[in-house]
């Protein structure tokens, strides 16, 4: 992860562990423990709902759908449970100082060679454990803006089911918010609106129990440059500067994530069974009716292990995330018929949008040597719960007008290019039509608004002060495509970074703003000098060359099973049902038709809560 490892490790400590194995005789006589690693425990059994993926969204669904004791639910997760290595997940700063990137605990995905990033292959770590990426991310809890969520709703069909008010309700349902400790509140001058938050949900949110001087200086400097402190960024306007919440449970200062929030409290439900360490290799369909009916799934521990089958009485729900969900659909015969036919896969539903529309927050970080070591934050896990609760969370979501002296000029370029981009893509006519509508919405609604095109993040860690910039609404579009029938072979991941040069221009201006911040008081008073990229980078060309060599993922891929009308290349409808099927849904970040200007955890929790209500008919 050259060029980004110093700051990206904050959200990429991927750790797995062994899990207990318990035998289950049948669905009606569960053991008291719901989690097993033995594939035979589900083999041949039938459940009302089979959930593919025990990650951020999957465990929300497992909890809500199994609340009725008369409803049986099975979850199949490729990773292990993580219970034996619990501290690596629940200690917040363990994600900084005990990283498992590029180990067995990491999916170890990589992109294809990126033409516009010096042909580099970027590392794409993803959580492979119960809880998914909510178990291993940087703990940022940031919500999107009302403007972009309503654009999502309109693109999806306009029924209002996915309006801001609907998603906000789901996000609040998932949250139990607690205010900051007084010392941190006073130092960082934190103000908040408790009414914007949930108080009884499974996921704890609060601010870390300690903070560091550069965090305060970052906030004050950003405020002095823009005058945009936001004291209520969770109620539909996330623009401005603030210290974001972290997904931390204030009662014990531990990470709050989907496993310990949604699964552990219900671990004795006799109607819920969670299988870990097994990969779903394909969905089984009955194709005798008008629409294909999902009747179950095949799964296995590895390509060398026995294949098993579990049956679904009501529905199969895919919650594999932006990479694995389109992969599973394609392996099961749902996707672009040309791709599937070329691999010898029987076409169940010709849906050319599967795997298309991939969007990611591309980012990089600048680093600065602090004048005093004490200003560089922690360097290891201490064993003190409050001290170890510190994670980076200072952010500034800056508008187009703050990045460019002439906002109208850059906006005009974006709007002109938006009318042309889709036609340049080698995709089906339906996908092209949907992309064209999305581009027009970005150009005409999102970019002219206060919705931020670039996020600035202030970090202290590893003896350094670093500030990161991340593009929030990329114009470039990529794809996820399988390359073989082998379910254990990784798909081709092509985010197509900087295929649209305007993405590079937007991010470039973000870094120029960061340099300006570093040279302004009070932040400059704790900085000795800039170490990365250093003073050799001065011209626009210098900046762009450095970005191409240093940029990577901010770990927020989305939109590969887009919620759009089928005629616009959509994969799921507003009920999250896959087109051409009667009972197959996708519930995860892959369904958002456009990227959101936030860290995705809050969106996925809210989305899954809304999805559960839809499935249950609430």
Swiss-Prot record:
Record-given protein name: GMC oxidoreductase family protein Mala s 12.0101
Residues annotated as signal peptide: 1-23
The UniProt record lists the keyword NADP: no
Source organism: Malassezia sympodialis (Atopic eczema-associated yeast)
GO CC terms, sorted: extracellular region
EC number: 1.-.-.-
A Gene Ontology molecular function term of the record: oxidoreductase activity, acting on CH-OH group of donors
Residue positions of the active site: 556 (proton donor), 599 (proton acceptor)
Chief location bin: secreted
Catalytic EC class: oxidoreductase
Pfam families in the cross-refs: GMC_oxred_C, GMC_oxred_N
InterPro entries: FAD/NAD-bd_sf (IPR036188), Glucose_Oxidase_domain_2 (IPR027424), GMC_OxRdtase (IPR012132), GMC_OxRdtase_N (IPR000172), GMC_OxRtase_C (IPR007867)
Protein family per UniProt: Belongs to the GMC oxidoreductase family.
Cofactor names: FAD
PANTHER family for this protein: GLUCOSE-METHANOL-CHOLINE GMC OXIDOREDUCTASE, GLUCOSE-METHANOL-CHOLINE OXIDOREDUCTASE N-TERMINAL DOMAIN-CONTAINING PROTEIN
Organism superkingdom: Eukaryota
